[in-house]
């Protein structure tokens, strides 16, 4: 079977068991194919006329079987948030799309309140994967970002994402919410 035919077939399959729109199902199926074939979207499209190997077809079917009971981000161990890819596992929550608008608002408010040369300090309490704080740090490298998390499993996920982002304006602290930082001040 050609990759394009398989993609259409599995898009319908995703649509049936997730109750997503056809567009959402196609995007999800494309993510599965990109993961299995280890390609980006343009490369996937270039390969539409290639034959899908039995091995890769089986891998796709295995992922789809898991997908019946588990979000795709947990299966693939990654999630795109605000144009960046983050490591995710079931020890942290999957970032929601509407959280991206919070990022936009924090940046907008921060830009209004602080000049370029001033340092803004952003606290991400209960950071989980760290995607919110890391995204802020990526968008505003002149700001200081503090990630706060209590659970060691989530801290491990945040550490992986910190290594991937390679920013020096972020600190990660294991803490029971605000106890050790009570005497500090934060802008957001």
Segments (PLM) and residue ranges:
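Structured loop/turn residues at beta-strand edges in well-structured enzyme cores
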Residues: 27, 168, 184
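Short, Lys/Arg-enriched, disordered terminal segments
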Residues: 1-17, 108-119, 182-183
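Active-site catalytic microenvironments for nucleophilic, acid-base chemistry
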Residues: 35, 39, 109, 139, ...
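SAM-dependent Rossmann-like transferase core, predominantly class I methyltransferases
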Residues: 59-140, 145-160, 174, 179
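Short, conserved SAM-binding/catalytic segment
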Residues: 158-170
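N-terminal auxiliary segments of SAM/dcSAM-dependent transferases
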Residues: 1-79
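A short acidic, Gly/Pro-enriched loop at the edge of an enzyme's catalytic core
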Residues: 179-188
């Amino acid at each position: 079977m050609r990759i394009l035919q398989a993609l259409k077939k599995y898009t319908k399959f995703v649509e049936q068991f997730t109750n997503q729109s056809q567009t959402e199902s196609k995007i999800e199926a494309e993510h599965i194919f990109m993961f299995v074939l280890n390609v980006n979207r343009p490369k996937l499209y270039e390969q539409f006329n290639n034959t899908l190997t039995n091995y890769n077809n089986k891998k796709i079917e295995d992922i789809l079987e898991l997908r019946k009971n588990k979000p795709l981000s947990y299966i693939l161990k990654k999630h795109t948030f605000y144009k960046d890819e983050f490591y995710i596992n079931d020890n942290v929550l999957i970032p929601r799309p509407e959280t991206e608008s919070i990022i936009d608002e924090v940046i907008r408010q921060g830009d209004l309140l602080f000049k370029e040369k001033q340092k803004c300090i952003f606290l991400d309490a209960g950071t989980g994967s760290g995607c919110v704080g890391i995204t802020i740090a990526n968008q505003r490298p002149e700001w200081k970002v503090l990630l706060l998390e209590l659970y060691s499993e989530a801290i491990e996920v945040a550490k992986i994402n910190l290594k991937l982002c390679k920013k020096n304006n972020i600190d990660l602290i294991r803490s029971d919410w605000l106890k050790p930082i009570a005497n500090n001040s934060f802008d957001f």
